[in-house]
Structure formats: structure tokens, C-alpha cells
Amino acid sequence: MNDCAYQTVTNKLTDYKVGRGKWNLEVTKETVQELEVTYSAPAAMPAIEQNLIPKKDDTFVQFGNFGSIKKIIQSRLFYPTFITGLSGNGKTFSVEQACAQLGRELIRVNITIETDEDDLIGGFRLVDGSTVWHNGPVVEALERGAILLLDEIDLASNKILCLQSILEGKGVFLKKIGKRVDPASGFNVFATANTKGKGSDDTIHWN
């Protein structure tokens, strides 16, 4: 009981006062030299070259406005095209097979209400401890002169307004890295939708 007397407990607590930021550590010369070594993050892995030409499907049967789509792609002219029609009637598949038959690269982007500039144009990504700029699918298509397919574009929000200059054939300025990307020869944009929206009726309607 005597060990639990008030004065005894108070004395013991006084002996074990906690100091702020105080550590009793032994630092050797080797430790100091090790701490002084400058850490250099490894470089980001280079992008892997990919073949983006779709595979031909032997079961595909040409129908509807497939001939018009194929001619537009074959011309290699910038002629952005909006294709509408019921869900599942071959809008996307026809663009893919036209590219497959013509040996043209295709980059497909599935659009949702959450799709934003970072998803489309690109942004910084964390790679091995460093922030590295990664091109989005739109910039990739611009640089490669590929066909860009924006699937289900009628589901998009106003976040895709970043595509306005690209749809005018003027390329895009990447403000985050101060670089301008102009469309390479052959670049074109196709967009598909299940509805015609409230814009122009000048579209390819898929029956």
C-alpha cells in the first residue's frame, strides 16, 4: 500500500516526463553518410508500341451505311462523322471492321457521364515515385493519325467540351505541359449514339 501513496506516485511520474521531439539515438558516421546519399527515382518505362488495327471478323456482313463509313476512312480526310441508331445494331462494329479491312489503326473510347478531360486528353500519373505525363486516347490518336471512335457519346456531360478544337480539326494544346499536338495525316473522329440528341439532322442513321 505504501508504494501507492500519493507522494510516491507523484515522484515516479516526475522522473518519467516526456520531452517533445527528444530521442536518445546514437548516430554513427556511417549512418550520416547513408542519409546523405541522394535518392534518384527510376525513369518511367517507355510506352510499348502496339498494333491498333482491329482484327477482321469473317462473320461480318456489310449492311446499311457501311460503304459510306469505309469511303470516309479510306479517304484519309478529316471528316468527323456522327452515327446514330438503336442499341446493338452494329454501329461500333461497322467502324471497327472498316478499319480492319483498310488496315487503319482504331482507338475506341467508351463515353460515360463521368468521362472528363483527364480520361480523354491525359494527365499526370504516379510512376515509381515520380509524376509522369501520360497521353490520353485522344492525344494518342492525334499523334498516330488513327481513327478515334467515341462510343455512346450521347451519355457524356459537358466535361467533354475539351474536344471542341479537336472536332474542328485544329488539334489541342496540352496546357499542363505546355505542348501543342496537331493531328497527323489520316486522323478522323467517329462518334456513335443511340439517340440523335437535339442538334443537326446531318448524321448517318443506322437502321
What are the functions of these language-model segments?
Residues 3-40:
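Charged low-complexity interaction tracts in eukaryotic proteins
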Residues 41-207:
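AAA+ P-loop NTPase catalytic core and its hallmark functional loops
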Residues 2, 6, 153-156:
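Alpha-helix N-cap/helix-initiation sites
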